[in-house]
């Protein structure tokens, strides 16, 4: 099947797009050669699909046209007078549909008289012609619009299995129980981006970048005395001109004798590197239930097995930018660097905001993996014969 979509938000020649899809499945358990396994395998099906959808990414209803505004040109005089003129704040955004093409192959099964059943899917999702802002030379006199300049590929899988059964007699009544396990993972990578210089500046992407990458310094302990602090005044001068005992020391990864971000490019990232990734990995859920003699109890757990998190918030650091932004607890006080506590978790107390010791770094990168009890329900089903007496 397919769909043909149009949007008045795009220019006339980019307004329409066709998005087809197709799927196929094969129930192997229905084939004659499979009959010998039918006592164990109740159902086995493989399936595959491919399909495309469109994302409508625009700013406003007519972003493909420039908006011209009247403005007094205060920087120029003509014949001794300030003249009025027209200003084009940005170039038109000549964009069209983002296209999301998903390929999926899956397996459905049920075993042991439908007591064990589940499904597995592996997919590749290509997002083509992603809309991003274009950087233009400053000499142009206006900012660039948006264009379809990026592609991204997401590869992932999803697994779900359920065991559901009944024990016929437990203290005079049957006991029903079930357990469901779900697990999934994905990673997304930029496969095309208009970034010829490999800039690592905020908001920029580059080909080969894994979504969620965290760039930062590698922590190399604390500055422990005034002599070492004097050395860091030179080695780490691009971060701050003055260092003290209890401040963080960073590793010189490229061996050039100074700690800095280089040119903030892939070819010259200075002493920074990828130290983690904020993408949640290996999401899981557990659902269990027991029913007996009218009582039911159900519980749902969910979580993430792997995720890195850089928080950098005032709440995390405790001592922060002045008394009004600080949130100091006893934990912060007990775990802050002093001469008597040189291996503490936090650096010396200071109020320099995100300077010196608060650069993105390995030491304070948090493990954001978790498990939580999302829901638990206890219920009782009133017997019908009781209700009939009401």
How should each PLM-predicted stretch be described?
Residues 1-10, 15-30, 100-102, 111-118, ...:
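Surface-exposed extracellular loop regions of Gram-negative outer-membrane beta-barrel proteins
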Residues 10-16, 36-38, 52-67, 130-134, ...:
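Outer-membrane beta-barrel and related beta-rich outer-membrane complex signature
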Residues 62, 147, 166-278:
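Conserved small-residue
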Residues 52, 73-117, 145-172, 208-215, ...:
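Outer-membrane beta-barrel signature, preferentially recognizing the C-terminal barrel domain
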Residues 29-44, 112-115, 166-177, 190-195, ...:
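Short loop/turn motifs that connect adjacent beta-strands in outer-membrane beta-barrel proteins
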Residues 92-96, 122-167, 218, 250-263, ...:
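Outer membrane beta-barrel strand-and-loop segments of large Gram-negative receptors
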Residues 7, 304-390:
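Extracytoplasmic gating/loop element in the C-terminal half of outer-membrane beta-barrel translocons
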Residues 35-99, 117-152, 194-200:
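Solvent-exposed loop/turn elements at secondary-structure boundaries
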């Amino acid at each position: 099947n397919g769909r043909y979509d149009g949007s008045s938000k795009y220019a006339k020649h980019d307004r329409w797009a066709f998005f087809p899809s197709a799927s196929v499945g094969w129930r192997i358990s229905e084939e004659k050669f499979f009959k010998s396994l039918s006592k164990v395998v109740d159902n086995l099906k493989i399936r595959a699909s491919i399909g495309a959808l469109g994302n409508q990414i625009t700013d406003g209803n007519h972003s493909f046209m420039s908006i011209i505004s009247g403005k007094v040109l205060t920087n120029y005089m003509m014949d001794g007078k300030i003249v009025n003129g027209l200003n084009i704040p940005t170039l038109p955004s000549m964009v069209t549909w983002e296209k999301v093409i998903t390929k999926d192959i899956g397996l459905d099964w049920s075993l042991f008289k439908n007591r064990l059943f589940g499904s597995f899917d592996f997919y590749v999702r290509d997002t083509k012609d992603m809309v991003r802002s274009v950087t233009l030379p400053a000499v142009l006199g206006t900012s660039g619009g948006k264009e379809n300049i990026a592609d991204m590929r997401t590869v992932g899988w999803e697994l779900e299995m359920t065991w559901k059964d009944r024990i016929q007699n437990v203290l005079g009544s049957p006991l029903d129980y079930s357990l469901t396990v779900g697990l999934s993972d994905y990673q997304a990578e930029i496969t095309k981006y208009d970034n010829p210089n490999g800039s690592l500046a905020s908001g920029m992407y580059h080909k080969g970048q894994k979504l969620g990458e965290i760039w930062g310094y590698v922590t190399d302990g604390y500055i422990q005395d005034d002599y070492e602090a004097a050395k860091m005044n030179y080695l780490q001068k691009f971060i701050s001109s003055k260092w003290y005992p209890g401040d963080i020391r960073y590793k010189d990864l490229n061996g050039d004798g100074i700690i800095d971000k280089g040119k903030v490019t892939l070819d010259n990232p200075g002493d920074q590197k990828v130290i983690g990734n904020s993408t949640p990995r290996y999401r899981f859920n557990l659902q269990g239930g027991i029913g007996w003699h009218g009582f039911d109890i159900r519980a749902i757990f969910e979580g993430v097995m792997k995720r890195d998190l850089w928080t950098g918030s005032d709440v995390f650091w405790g001592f922060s930018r002045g008394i009004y932004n600080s949130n100091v607890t006893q934990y912060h006080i007990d775990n802050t660097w002093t001469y008597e506590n040189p291996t503490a978790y936090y650096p010396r107390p200071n109020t320099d905001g995100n300077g010196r010791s608060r650069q993105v770094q390995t030491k304070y990168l948090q493990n954001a993996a978790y498990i939580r009890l999302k829901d638990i329900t206890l219920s009782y089903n009133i017997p019908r014969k009781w209700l009939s007496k009401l």
